[in-house]
A protein has these predicted regions:
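Active-site bordering "gate/hinge" segments
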Residues: 1-157
């Protein structure tokens, strides 16, 4: 993954030198001041004008930082899956994903998943769409929604 750093830096430089892109994204998709439940880059970009331009640069900064970490300490080892046998019980886990926090709760009965609940940032961010698009031109509405980086797979889960 660390080999991607030069290409990413070239992209960041190119985007920074594109005034048309900045003028198109700046001031578009500003989040409502009463927005709650934000997480991930959408929340962290809120202190950066909270618009589509700020969210783009927040994501680029986070990708750059992640590649810097990988370069400094190496790629992470993937966990080894183990056989849990026929165990039963409940569990919860939270993890920071590229789109924000995800929380998983599940129940096992005799080694089989009986119920689960997956709560992702996209499920919270989808609630912003109506506020971001109301009264906007179509192009601005599309930019606003696109800047939220919604995953259709997470929204419908």
């Amino acid at each position: 993954l660390a080999e991607l750093a030069p290409a990413l830096q070239a992209l960041v430089t190119r985007l920074g030198r594109t005034p048309w892109l900045k003028s198109r994204l700046k001031g578009i998709g500003i989040l409502p001041s009463d927005a709650t439940g934000l997480s991930g880059p959408v929340a962290r970009a809120d202190g950066n004008a909270g618009d589509a331009w700020g969210r783009l640069w927040q994501r680029l900064d986070e990708i750059t930082t992640s590649l810097d970490f990988i370069k400094a300490i190496g790629e992470p080892e993937l966990p080894v899956l183990r056989n849990i046998g026929h165990g039963s019980g409940t569990g919860e886990a939270s993890v920071e994903t590229p789109r924000g926090q995800a929380q998983l709760s599940l129940t096992l009965e005799h080694g089989q998943v009986k119920s689960y609940k997956l709560d992702t940032a996209c499920r919270h961010h989808i609630g912003l769409v109506a506020q971001l698009v109301e009264g906007r031109e179509l192009g601005d509405a599309l930019v606003s929604v696109g800047s939220l980086d919604l995953s259709p797979w997470e929204v419908i889960s």
